[in-house]
């Protein structure tokens, strides 16, 4: 049984595919005053945690982020065991897994001209990516959050990490309300996806076309539509019913995504409105992320 308390040391384990943004994530945690260590072998995690807890004079770092690399790892499935040991010792452990589509990874390697870590095995780049997906499958299964960075630039990824994972949060469920454009794909990390394309589109109003769903003109237009009001009422009823079921301690993060054609008006409006509703209902850890806007 875990002995984690709200004031417990925090350990973020950063894992995932090479080229998916792990280095950006670790640098972001470092910028947020986390003590960071990269490429730590899994079998050293227990000693790492013990050294963290052994220093009782207050000088030991309370927030750490550790990068786990696929190279040289004998058995990545051990992560669950080491994670439980850390939790039993009173450390608040979170596992993040970063990934991207094959097409995105191939383009990133072409742009940077860097070699894939598994290329030393004589594999082509597509083969190395496929092999790494197989090797890291145990890490992905263990993750509290899977973050697909295919559509994110460095600045967007940094902002997302800061918003979701580095702020001091009360214990409980972290809620992210996200907007997206269907033409760029559904967010892979979404737990719930709602289609806003059935609603009236402000794009066809010349006075609203250049605005986003965060601006008063678009909000007023959508809130005046009976279909939007009915859609909102049904969404609120659904989320009010089922989000508490996910906040019983079995989940750490939930992403609720809203999609429309361009990710600019309807989906943004819904994400902002439902985030506001969640705060009004007493949820403390609520954030928004507009994939096509931020």
Curated annotation (Swiss-Prot):
Function: Displays ATPase and GTPase activities.
One Pfam entry name: RapZ-like_N
Naturally occurring in which organism (per UniProt): Stenotrophomonas maltophilia (strain K279a)
Keyword field contains Signal: no
Stated family: Belongs to the RapZ-like family.
Protein name (record): Nucleotide-binding protein Smlt1108
Signal sequence extent: none
Molecular function in Gene Ontology: ATP binding; GTP binding
Chain residues that bind ATP: 16-23
Positions bound to GTP: 69-72
Keyword set, alphabetical order: ATP-binding, GTP-binding, Nucleotide-binding
Residues forming coiled coils: none
UniProt keyword annotation of GTP-binding present: yes
Superkingdom of origin organism: Bacteria
SUPFAM superfamilies: P-loop containing nucleoside triphosphate hydrolases (SSF52540)
